[in-house]
A protein has these predicted regions:
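Metal-dependent catalytic neighborhoods of phosphoester/phosphodiester hydrolases
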Residues: 37-40, 67-86, 103-122, 201-205
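Active-site neighborhood of phospho(di)ester-bond hydrolases with catalytic His/Asp-centered motifs
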Residues: 27-29, 63-68, 94-101, 127-128, ...
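Active-site environment of divalent metal-dependent phosphoester hydrolases
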Residues: 32-35, 71-74, 97-111, 146-148, ...
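Conserved catalytic scaffold of divalent metal-dependent phosphoesterases
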Residues: 83, 95-181
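Conserved beta-sheet core of the metallophosphoesterase superfamily
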Residues: 173-240
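Non-catalytic terminal accessory segments
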Residues: 2-10, 254-327
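Beta-strand-turn-beta hairpins that frame and shape the catalytic cleft
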Residues: 18-26, 131-141, 155-160, 204-208, ...
């Protein structure tokens, strides 16, 4: 019991005190709240997710979510009430843009049928579709299907882009920003969601690109094996200037929250055989075509494209462990 109490105290420990006039803004992405436990996880995933959200809410004045707060757009009343209880406890702190999982068919006019829309309508969450000001800073949203040409240019290089976009993803160019886009747009910082993998910061002219990765680990991608769970904190006194830092959220090692089979598979990938890149898999899957009579068999299509057997086996296993039908 004492050990459990210590863990809880460590998890909710406040950050180092800052001067009272400093506002702290947390940026996270791809929370993927879900009611059903991912098959690869051995813990109570929903509770783990809510604990992370409470941690960032307690340690920051505001929390900005760069898309995909929920894993599916329409959830049960029980899940809504559970999330509502947490968000209402920290009412006024939550800001978000929509991700592709948050809405029905990416339709922003269907918020009344989405769980995230319910949070918005009861006043627990601010959803943003236009630039908004927060603590003297301007944040500009870009959704997954926003054309980069429609994103306003930051001529003064002082604003912050919050986008649910890949970065130069050849599999999904319509859902991506490129380095040329970033140079043209001219934002001081650009935070991208959508891609769950964490990357090092990159710099394009005067723009700092941040792709921190998802707040949660929901699958068996190899990058989930050893990575830290983090958020970015922006600190400002309200004068338009700010500083930022990468902050680690308390989390359990993958070996403690994944089932043994999933963890062993993640450990083996890349050790005994060449790691299968999901970008490469995406290039293969993009060649699938729909016909009037139905959808081509994934297995037959992969074999017709001379996909290596070990790659096919890995794709099949990832489908099964995540409860996705493989045909």
């Amino acid at each position: 019991m004492a050990k459990k109490k210590k863990l809880e105290e460590d998890f909710l420990a406040p950050a180092t005190p800052l001067p009272p006039n400093v506002t702290k803004i947390c940026i996270i992405t791809d929370v993927h709240i879900m009611e059903r436990n991912p098959r690869c996880r051995s813990d109570r995933f929903l509770n783990t997710t809510l604990e992370k959200l409470e941690y960032v809410a307690k340690n920051n004045d505001y929390v900005i979510i760069a898309g995909d707060l929920f894993h599916i757009h329409n959830n049960s009343s029980l899940l809504f009430n559970t999330v509502f209880t947490l968000f209402n406890k920290y009412r006024g702190k939550w800001h978000a843009i929509l991700g592709n999982h948050d809405t029905f068919n990416r339709n922003t006019n269907a918020l009344d049928r989405c769980t995230i829309g319910s949070l918005y309508y009861v006043g627990c969450l601010d959803l943003h579709f236009q630039p908004w000001d927060l603590a003297g800073l301007t944040f500009v949203p870009a959704l997954v299907n926003t054309n980069p040409k429609d994103i306003e240019v930051d001529v003064d290089n002082k604003n912050i882009l919050i986008a649910h976009k890949f970065f130069e993803n050849g599999f999904a160019p319509d859902e991506s920003l490129t380095r040329d886009d970033l140079r043209r747009l001219g934002y001081k910082m650009a935070f991208l969601g959508h891609d769950h993998s964490p990357y090092e910061e990159e710099f394009f002219r005067q723009t700092t690109l941040v792709r921190m990765g998802s707040l949660t680990r929901i699958d068996t991608q190899r990058y989930n094996k050893d990575r830290e769970i983090c958020y970015y904190q922006i600190r400002t006194t309200g004068n338009g200037e700010f500083e930022y830092s990468r902050e680690v959220i308390p989390y359990k090692p993958t070996s403690e929250c994944y089932i043994e089979e999933a963890y062993q598979h993640m450990s083996a990938v890349g050790a005994e055989k060449k790691e299968v890149s999901f970008v490469q898999i995406g290039d293969v899957l993009s060649k699938l075509t729909r016909r009037a009579g139905g959808v081509n068999s994934l297995d037959k299509t992969l074999r017709r494209l001379n996909t290596p057997d070990d790659s096919i086996a890995d794709i099949k296993w990832r489908h099964e462990i995540n409860s996705i039908s493989y045909t």
